[in-house]
């Protein structure tokens, strides 16, 4: 009987495979670091204060800050007083992008944060728990001389969190509050060339709308979008990796179906992991270049969630199926305690994402964090997911500890074997430990590169070479997990080579039909493994 490929592979061949995968891993990092630009670009926008002198402020007219049909504008709020311009007559206008530039579908998404410049006035201070209410209209067009088409119109409330560091005295009037930035807008596609934002701050003293919010001098926006060059590199990687993982997945399942036994749990989970990786890799983002698919961000979150849930489940089942004790765990029900937190945590994060990006499909200005109830609800989902994640890692660490402890304990039986047979078993145990350490190394590398990308400036310079650290993080880690899944399906595919055929004169001292594989879950037609029989006998004694 043959075991998995990793059990029949010599150390030399295993090192060759590892070396090839390492080369591809280095290439993945270099593609992002040397070829791709930074993942995102941030652009600052200063709103232009336009004057709407009409009595009825309807949305039939769009106020453009510059160009041939630019609005009647004022430089600052003080200019409005002698011209008898009221607060309700002022429209803060922002044109996206800046002059002489165009947006592109390659930018994939637009995220905007808002910064209010609020001056201190003794007779108009910011009250406690103040809320600014904005009437926001968003329009688009694809030609510089075409008419604007409305895309969204919403009332956007945001709570102010401002502090004034100087004493509140007359001589400090005119100084600005220090206010937190506010989430403003998120769009999941950039299907048009030009966008226009018209922001009003309507004042209604009877209804206490925009009362006690200080004197707002200016509105600033920071727009963040994905770089087109990075998008092309990212799409190219997904296009290359999709057939690679799909082909190895088909090959893996074909070898399993050729066996005389049904697939065991570990093999099914590895196959499911390959499916989830393929689901992430399929480059459906290519269609976003020609179609206005605003749901792509949400769809991407769902795909990643499915993959991470499968990856976490695989680690638990991988450890459990190599526990080497008297318990049989060839059923997913045997892991309900460990897999349960994964399911609950994933569900909580899915609900949170639907409450945020799901609502943004119809209202790009929505944020669950802008209200007390929304914030409490979001924090509840995140805390529950965090608790589930902690429980999962406690279970995982405990199972990894048990596996290594059991392996160390069972090694006491090895000296009684013949030399060749003992060396073979020691090799199997070494390869299992090696794969466990590779898993930990992949997880550690993900965390390390994430931290490095957050604390660095985004790029390093060595002489005339610039390395984009953030891009290298995205492409390198993405390539790493693809290689990880590829290696799992290749190394853990059933081998069609029998040990008896590979070793002359029965050097291993094993009877015909006796298994020498490490996987401990095959208890069907082919019988249990040699290590499983050995360790189970000791456990029963």
Curated annotation (Swiss-Prot):
Repeat found in the keyword field: no
Mutation effect (residue 478 to C): In ZKS; results in decreased secretion of WNT3A and WNT5A; decreased activation of WNT signaling
Species of provenance: Homo sapiens (Human)
Record note on quaternary structure: Interacts with WNT3A. Interacts with WNT1, WNT3 and WNT5A.
Gene Ontology terms, MF aspect: identical protein binding; Wnt-protein binding
GO cellular component, one term: plasma membrane
Cytoplasmic compartment segments: 1-15, 254-268, 325-331, 402-431, 493-541
Protein name: Protein wntless homolog
Record function comment: Regulates Wnt proteins sorting and secretion in a feedback regulatory mechanism. This reciprocal interaction plays a key role in the regulation of expression, subcellular location, binding and organelle-specific association of Wnt proteins. Plays also an important role in establishment of the anterior-posterior body axis formation during development.
